Amino acid sequence: GPALGFTRYVQNHRIPSPELDAFSSGRNWADASDASVEIWVESEEAFSVACASPEAAEAGLILEQDEKRFTSAKKISAFLGQEHVIFDHLAASHRFGPEDKTVKMVCQVWKRPELNAAAFQERWRIGHGNLVRQLAEPMGFKRYVQTHPVSSPTVAAFAGPRGWRQPPDGLTEIWWESEQALIHSFSAPEAAEAGAVLQKDEVQFVDPKKVTAFLAREHVVF
């Protein structure tokens, strides 16, 4: 991690959720991945400097060899992103404490082909972000984060030799206090109404057939 400039590393492990599966299929979303990884760096510049060192090259080879043992490279993608916390009603003690029961939806977002990246990101962050904030209570949403891609030759150079595929146009993460809270929220008529409003807005700027989502628990490695 340190040799590559990594400052934080979190694994999101998929857990079964008939409720979220129904939510996804109702939107005609694609099949989701088995897990996702989030890695933090201080900046693109710091990451680029770290990756230029001999130690980083050696560490990268070790990681690549290990990845081949349990992942399918052609199904993996990566991008450098900037987080936008739209709202956060989860106390840190609740999210990371010993009694942490939080779960989150990890959603790869793809834009409609006629939109450029700037128009898509503005529509997603401002228009849709405000709508999600308004409908958070009936949906049981406690925290909502959008991650927007930023240009990174370093990440492209890291992903290319590994044969990774094209990354999505963004990532959505939505937290619930617990799996039980998600189930309770999704069973309420108010959630169905709010979900329909969100879906009507989503199709104006996302490509549903490429979007994927799964329910996960966070595992903070460091």
PLM-predicted stretches and their roles:
Residues G1-F222:
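Macromolecular interaction modules
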